């Protein structure tokens, strides 16, 4: 009987440790809005919650919509950089939440691709960004999303 109780305690404590470890990982994912429907499709993941990369081809008339999701809704992403590189010398406009273009008013560092801290209540804000092409040709694109820091908003 004692052996059975000890095994049960060991199993329960192992499950508890595994659940706590899974909560400590703040996964980061990049989702793209589907062209044919209004659904968001997961295109890239980052287990460490710091960096993810996604490659795609943009046609000359494409308007690409993305959102960055985090697994832990009690944290917000601070110092988030979105870098878009192109094989060709392409020009793209990056727009953040509510289709506001990245400019000096919402980009404290004065360059497109930097998202300042998102002020929000617990889990209420998800960074969205869109990419509009102003070129006449197709281009291969690489998206790199980097988060330097996280801020704990609240305890649930």
UniProtKB/Swiss-Prot annotation:
<dbReference type="GO" id="GO:0005576">
    <property type="term" value="C:extracellular region"/>
</dbReference>
<feature type="signal peptide">
    <location>
        <begin position="1"/>
        <end position="27"/>
    </location>
</feature>
<feature type="glycosylation site" description="N-linked (GlcNAc...) asparagine">
    <location>
        <position position="103"/>
    </location>
</feature>
<keyword id="KW-0964">Secreted</keyword>
<feature type="glycosylation site" description="N-linked (GlcNAc...) asparagine">
    <location>
        <position position="83"/>
    </location>
</feature>
<keyword id="KW-0732">Signal</keyword>
<feature type="glycosylation site" description="N-linked (GlcNAc...) asparagine">
    <location>
        <position position="20"/>
    </location>
</feature>
<feature type="glycosylation site" description="N-linked (GlcNAc...) asparagine">
    <location>
        <position position="134"/>
    </location>
</feature>
<keyword id="KW-0325">Glycoprotein</keyword>
<protein>
    <recommendedName>
        <fullName>Uncharacterized protein DDB_G0281771</fullName>
    </recommendedName>
</protein>
<feature type="glycosylation site" description="N-linked (GlcNAc...) asparagine">
    <location>
        <position position="106"/>
    </location>
</feature>
